[in-house]
């Protein structure tokens, strides 16, 4: 299970410094078409102990760019890379939504030892990590993949199979996730034009939003046999 070891001391739950000062005014408006706001998920490792300190700022910049470019950030309500992306998102007064493996806030914080901070909304799935991963991915219009481990590859695979647009954050030797994903795509013999790569969070979010816009021209329908159909 994840712990708060990946959090900066000032951001550990209960710390007086963990409160953000943004107004939640952007959550209170009467626009009836808010459902059109893109939802971008952030997938990445919950344990950043094997990564350099610079990755924290990279994660925050991903969240900042999601907010600045007008999207809602979605995550697994976890620690590590997604957590720091949520911090960046809230720095720009963006909206941060989380999907928890737990059945409620007490289990989330005390059993799974996951943070509640920097989340505007948390859906408590009660389905554990694997069930949470599926619901998280299928609730997003697109996914950004940062440095990750097994759970990240599972989320990537679900999105890839469902043809959900993917933005892969490229690293210069800080992690190998992008290289591994490139290898998986190459050997899978299943081309997918809904995957983009970039080492710059601002450009990556912009590219992903373009893919999401194009993807919305088609309606996805899930059949009982789990096959995915596309209707113009």
Summary of predicted features, one role per range:
Residues 22-55:
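Positively charged, low-complexity intrinsically disordered leader regions
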Residues 144, 163-166:
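Structural loop-to-beta junction motif characteristic of Rossmann-like glycosyltransferase folds
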Residues 165-195:
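Nucleotide-sugar donor-binding patch of glycosyltransferase catalytic domains
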Residues 122-127, 192-204:
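Short acidic-hydrophobic, aromatic-tinged amphipathic segments that line or gate anion-handling sites
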Residues 210-232:
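C-terminal amphipathic helix plus adjacent low-complexity
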Residues 19-26, 124-127:
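Short gly/ser/thr-rich secondary-structure transition/capping motifs
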Residues 34-37, 48, 56-64, 68, ...:
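Acidic/glycine-enriched connector segments
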């Amino acid at each position: 299970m994840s712990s708060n070891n990946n959090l900066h001391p000032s951001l550990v739950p209960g710390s007086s410094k963990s409160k953000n000062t943004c107004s939640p005014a952007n959550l209170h408006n009467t626009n009836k078409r808010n459902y059109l706001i893109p939802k971008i998920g952030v997938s990445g490792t919950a344990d950043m102990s094997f990564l350099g300190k610079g990755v924290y700022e990279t994660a925050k910049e991903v969240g900042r760019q999601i907010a600045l470019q007008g999207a809602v950030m979605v995550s697994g309500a976890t620690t590590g890379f997604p957590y720091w992306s949520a911090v960046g998102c809230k720095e720009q007064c963006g909206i941060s939504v989380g999907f928890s493996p737990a059945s409620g806030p007490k289990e989330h914080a005390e059993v799974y030892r996951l943070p509640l901070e920097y989340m505007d909304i948390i859906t408590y799935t009660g389905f554990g990590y694997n069930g949470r991963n599926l619901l998280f991915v299928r609730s997003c219009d697109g996914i950004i993949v940062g440095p990750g481990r097994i759970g990240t590859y599972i989320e990537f695979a679900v999105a890839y199979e469902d043809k959900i647009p993917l933005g892969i954050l490229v690293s210069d030797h800080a992690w190998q996730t992008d290289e591994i994903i490139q290898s998986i795509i190459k050997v899978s013999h299943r081309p997918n034009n809904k995957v983009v790569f970039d080492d710059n969070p601002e450009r990556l979010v912009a590219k992903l939003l373009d893919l999401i816009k194009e993807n919305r021209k088609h309606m996805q329908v899930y059949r009982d046999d789990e096959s995915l159909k596309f209707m113009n």
